[in-house]
Amino acid sequence: MKLSVNEAQLGFYLGSLSHLSACPGIDPRSSEDQPESLKTGQMMDESDEDFKELCASFFQRVKKHGIKEVSGERKTQKAASNGTQIRSKLKRTKQTATKTKTLQGPAEKKPPSGSQAPRTKKQRVTKWQASEPAHSVNGEGGVLASAPDPPVLRETAQNTQTGNQQEPSPNLSREKTRENVPNSDSQPPPSCLTTAVPSPSKPRTAQLVLQRMQQFKRADPERLRHASEECSLEAAREENVPKDPQEEMMAGNVYGLGPPAPESDAAVALTLQQEFARVGASAHDDSLEEKGLFFCQICQKNLSAMNVTRREQHVNRCLDEAEKTLRPSVPQIPECPICGKPFLTLKSRTSHLKQCAVKMEVGPQLLLQAVRLQTAQPEGSSSPPMFSFSDHSRGLKRRGPTSKKEPRKRRKVDEAPSEDLLVAMALSRSEMEPGAAVPALRLESAFSERIRPEAENKSRKKKPPVSPPLLLVQDSETTGRQIEDRVALLLSEEVELSSTPPLPASRILKEGWERAGQCPPPPERKQSFLWEGSALTGAWAMEDFYTARLVPPLVPQRPAQGLMQEPVPPLVPPEHSELSERRSPALHGTPTAGCGSRGPSPSASQREHQALQDLVDLAREGLSASPWPGSGGLAGSEGTAGLDVVPGGLPLTGFVVPSQDKHPDRGGRTLLSLGLLVADFGAMVNNPHLSDVQFQTDSGEVLYAHKFVLYARCPLLIQYVNNEGFSAVEDGVLTQRVLLGDVSTEAARTFLHYLYTADTGLPPGLSSELSSLAHRFGVSELVHLCEQVPIATDSEGKPWEEKEAENCESRAENFQELLRSMWADEEEEAETLLKSKDHEEDQENVNEAEMEEIYEFAATQRKLLQEERAAGAGEDADWLEGGSPVSGQLLAGVQVQKQWDKVEEMEPLEPGRDEAATTWEKMGQCALPPPQGQHSGARGAEAPEQEAPEEALGHSSCSSPSRDCQAERKEGSLPHSDDAGDYEQLFSSTQGEISEPSQITSEPEEQSGAVRERGLEVSHRLAPWQASPPHPCRFLLGPPQGGSPRGSHHTSGSSLSTPRSRGGTSQVGSPTLLSPAVPSKQKRDRSILTLSKEPGHQKGKERRSVLECRNKGVLMFPEKSPSIDLTQSNPDHSSSRSQKSSSKLNEEDEVILLLDSDEELELEQTKMKSISSDPLEEKKALEISPRSCELFSIIDVDADQEPSQSPPRSEAVLQQEDEGALPENRGSLGRRGAPWLFCDRESSPSEASTTDTSWLVPATPLASRSRDCSSQTQISSLRSGLAVQAVTQHTPRASVGNREGNEVAQKFSVIRPQTPPPQTPSSCLTPVSPGTSDGRRQGHRSPSRPHPGGHPHSSPLAPHPISGDRAHFSRRFLKHSPPGPSFLNQTPAGEVVEVGDSDDEQEVASHQANRSPPLDSDPPIPIDDCCWHMEPLSPIPIDHWNLERTGPLSTSSPSRRMNEAADSRDCRSPGLLDTTPIRGSCTTQRKLQEKSSGAGSLGNSRPSFLNSALWDVWDGEEQRPPETPPPAQMPSAGGAQKPEGLETPKGANRKKNLPPKVPITPMPQYSIMETPVLKKELDRFGVRPLPKRQMVLKLKEIFQYTHQTLDSDSEDESQSSQPLLQAPHCQTLASQTYKPSRAGVHAQQEATTGPGAHRPKGPAKTKGPRHQRKHHESITPPSRSPTKEAPPGLNDDAQIPASQESVATSVDGSDSSLSSQSSSSCEFGAAFESAGEEEGEGEVSASQAAVQAADTDEALRCYIRSKPALYQKVLLYQPFELRELQAELRQNGLRVSSRRLLDFLDTHCITFTTAATRREKLQGRRRQPRGKKKVERN
């Protein structure tokens, strides 16, 4: 019985094992549950029957397998002789038993060796089972009964061993697991049984086993029960089992793998583990192939043919499947479908779902759907008692909270308002709201919200949400309509089915009619079904296509006036009239299509044709995009009346019937025919097909026309074509082309459209132009129509025509007039244009004798003017401050008179000036008499006048700008003053810069004065060039910028084109300008001024005026001191100026100053150029220059001076300019006086025209033109004036300047000392020392000339005539002009050009400057960025124009070009800078200008503008006092000397003309990026992490170098195009870029060395580069400029903080290429400077240093490219050792300082490493004792 007990124990144990393994929920490998399982098995071992059953089932299975798979070799052998098998197995078993015994030791008490062997085998079997995923598919957990035959067991063990051998790793792991967890549920013993394939025993036993197997085949093994068969089983077992004790022991051990019953479960487990270990050890000898067949215990599949791995996989799959089928769903309770939270009880889940649905706003229906989807499958499979029980218990726990929550929800449900309450609420809402639909929507939403809680409650879940009552949803009208629709459906159901689906009627029409008081909607017509119409069954009138339901008819407002209005009622019935009125402009083109009521039904073919035509017309309507009828004129009158006018301003939609106004008498067919005719002819408008004539407008657009139409419709036009036409080849076809000037393309197109179609629908905005065209070509009907065009109002209710007068007329017409004048000059005086070019050059090349005379006269006159203005400045200033137009006019008149007198005085000097003076006087009269409005009108008129005499225009424009500048300066001192604003406006309009200031005011103080000028010019020329964002007109009209009041005052104050530089020029310059057109244009200008007066504009204007005043000096002062103040302030500025050109410049005092500077520079620079070919031309050039000079110098003076100081400067400038001729006028019209002087000079129309024309051509608007061309002259003059003023301020500079400059400087110094105190503090011009005054003056001139090209203000600031002093003044002016970037630009350019002290030096500098324009072109590029359109506008291809591009006014001469390029470039850079710096102090801009001028000479290419160096220079300028001028000088020296070789002025100019440089790829927003992102971005370029701010700057810098704008990198460009200048430019820029000392040093070097003499101060390089670099952020003004003029710079420095702050802001905050480049340029420049310092460059002149830097860069570039390996590393951003590169460079003879090399590498984004150097340093530090380190550090 012991054996049976053991067997039973083993069987139950195995059965429990199998059972547990069948339970997937229990981990079969967990050893913790083993003891309990064993105990349970032992408890169930009480019955022997159970054990017998196990054995029987085991044997049955064994026999079954044996019988089935006897084919195996081993099986065959076993079957052959059981005895042999048994014996052999016994032997093996004995051996194994012995081993087992040895292993077991004392632990196994009972089992003899024989029984241990079977145990071992069984263990092996179990082990194999463990290794195999054991599943008992049959549920025979206890199948593991001991086999009666030990051999069989042994065999099984062997098989198991073989399996273990084959798969030792997995089996061992599983064996271990199962040894540790013998009862592991997951390991079904049946697999072991299957593994064991014992030889068949007795037949009786086999049968019994088979029977037992049938009983125990269950999916889930049940607990074994004691049965009566126990004895029989026992007997059978005894019979089957050999009597041999060993065998018995074997069988017992095999089946009772555990120790005897008494033994504990732990002992059994231990024994099993040991046995399994033995089996594993012995299993290596056997293989399944040798042992026999192998069957899957789960699916009974024969796996004998499989290797161990495949068998394991198969069994694992079977086990997995069995587990899936047997395992209860683990998530008994589904998780929350909303948040995924698991639950233990259903109630907890239910309560959570409710709460979660409320929190997550999930609707009940959606929640139910989710729950159903989620629980559909899991619930079906999950029903475990354990979980249900746990859920139950836990659910009970949660019942309390759940039940508590339910009542809460019930409360909520109770709280839900009743339906009555909801209805009441809805009703109240509906009463409060006008529309019923909206309340309905809100009601529904409210209702749904109320219903939601109900849906959440169980009680209400079943109830569908209740929709709000219809009573609440719809009003009575809607209900009535619905009822009517239902009835209609009942009555006409068939018809409705065939009709277009009804659309809800729109209430827009009804409301629109009510609001507009239009005729009621047309009466209901018979239903028109689109299906019928589209079927083309017959001709349909247009209104028939209009379905009320599709879109109710929209009737435009009835024309308040016009013929159209009258015919409308009679023409068509109400419906038709409304429909016709409703017609969109496009439909107007096809009005004939069935306008009248449908006539008798035509034939089918006719109907089809008509319907098709209607559809075609409708399609045309869709295609027509023009505001006026695109295809026909039938709807002309009606279209005109109702054009673009719809009730509520809503666009016409749907099928809008054409107007039937034209042919009320005719039937639909007649209208249709006419409509077809009109449509067909309308299609030919501007149609190139068969076109035999072309009309080219001022904008360059070409319109195609057909002569036969013109011949039939407009004989005068065809006559004009025949007379004026010329042949043009386009696309290889020779066609006749006619220039149609003074009219916009739109107007010309509309005119042609009328001729082709007789369409009366004329756009209100074009009525004036159309009227002019109609008058011009004798189309009386069109004239009448234009008169009848109703005054349409814009969205603001402002009359369209009024707005057009302000915007389009002032902008487009005035601009077109300028273009016209330019074209007229071009056509009428081709030679004059050529002469103008020559004259410009000649003007630049003014005779030295004349210049000297001018300087002398200016000095004397300025002294006189200073005295006079000092006396009258207060009165004039008060007048101007009064802001009354009368006072402004009076001042203007006084100034005009003074200027006229001065002009007369100067007449002996220049005969041309007499005319100019006369013109000025006339213009003064014209301008003075009209009030502000008249002045603005005058501006408008001036533009047309300019057309007539470009020369006079240019002169008057120039002169006018001068006055404007003075006025603006005065105004600048009193930015609040209206007069100041007007003056500023006038100045801007006159010079274009002021007009641009208007835009600057409104949008862009940032835009430099040059930009303003150019913008004005462009705006004058092109309506599109409405540079001023606030108002294109305003932009065109200088006055709007400053401020409407100022503009008007200035206009009144000065007859010069106050409204516009062009207008001013026309008025002042030529008698024709004084023609009645002037008043009209003045009015327009005035309207523009009013626009500029708009709050935003006014503020901008005031700001700009202040800034401009700083730039222009005088302009700001007009507010402080009227014309007198201006005059007085000019005495300060002008005193020097007047000293130079006191007598000559009286009238064109400013002009003369401008001329002096320009001409001096031109004479000095462009002596190479022929002296002005004609005295008149010279005078014209002088006049023009004086104009610019006056404007700029005045502005500069004011800018330099504080607001209070500016007026005196302005007066000084006026004195300087007007002393000779306009000492008195200077006071009031000093600014204008200079322009008048220009007019006098320009009085000779041909020459002056030529000069101005050349200028105007580049930028048609005189403002723009004056900024470009006349700006060149003007700018040069202004520069001269400014320079003179600067010289006056800084007598030493003046003395160092040209001999004239010295004289002027002395004179000015006499005067300047007065102005300088104010100017010096505020202006950087003063920074230049006396020695550098000339150089600076040259620098100013050179840059200022380029700038003059770009900006009259800026270029005049650095006028050559002013020489050193003027250069200083211009610098100061530029510095003051931070608001007016043009001034800044001018000064730098001027400085660059004026570097040379002597005239020769100046000439050299000017030549260099001319060559430096490429360098200077950079700043001009910014100007062009703002005003680049001007260039394309100029019809005349002029070098000056190109130069203007580079330096807006480079038309004058190479030197002027240089100055202009530099100035324009400086101006542009300031223009860009102005965005930021304009807010800054004027000194900042001046410094910037000086710096940029220096930069310009070095590299005044666009790169410099983009370079942060330029911006930094601007800031540095503010920081740096006189140093700033030296940088300009340095560039002039470098630029003047090298520029010749580097001269690419035209290219640079072209660049300037290009649109603003904008990166093709927008710069990422580095400023707002997170630090990790910035680090990653830097890592891409191999840059180590830096502080966030530095990373931002560095990334921006990298972006600038890696993402090119239209041009290559600014520095690269400047370096490549201007190798010599680039390095200096970079340095200058670097110094400019918050490197005051560096920039100052360069400027000083250039100023000191000039071309040669001004360099002495070059060595005075201060540590500024680094210092400024550090101060790039702080913008501390380093006042270490070697020049002694630094004190004035200091004053500027005081102002610097604001502009610098703005610059810093732009650098920090803006992702613009400018700021990033500025930082990079700054660093680059600093590196160069430091390198230069290291190399002892301090002793080298600025120009030499620039040349060296450029050469060094080029050498480095060439060297890197010559080394393929190094170049590849550079291209791939692979770092290379810096020290190695330095060593290689030294070996190759390239000596480059470390700092310069670093700067070069950083500038070009070349990745390098200094790891070796750092390691060495670290090692050295480690070696050094700490004390030494400290000492070294100290």
Swiss-Prot record:
Source organism (scientific name): Homo sapiens (Human)
Protein name: Structure-specific endonuclease subunit SLX4
Ranges annotated as biased composition (Acidic residues): 1394-1403
PANTHER family linked: BTB POZ DOMAIN CONTAINING 12, STRUCTURE-SPECIFIC ENDONUCLEASE SUBUNIT SLX4
GO BP annotations, alphabetical order: DNA double-strand break processing involved in repair via single-strand annealing; DNA repair; DNA replication; double-strand break repair via homologous recombination; negative regulation of telomere maintenance via telomere lengthening; nucleotide-excision repair; positive regulation of t-circle formation; positive regulation of telomere maintenance
Annotated stretches, region: Interaction with SLX4IP, ERCC4/XPF and MSH2: 1-669
Record-linked Pfam families: BTB, Slx4
Biased amino acid composition, Polar residues: 78-87, 156-172, 180-204, 376-385, 986-1002, 1059-1073, 1124-1133, 1245-1254, 1269-1279, 1481-1504
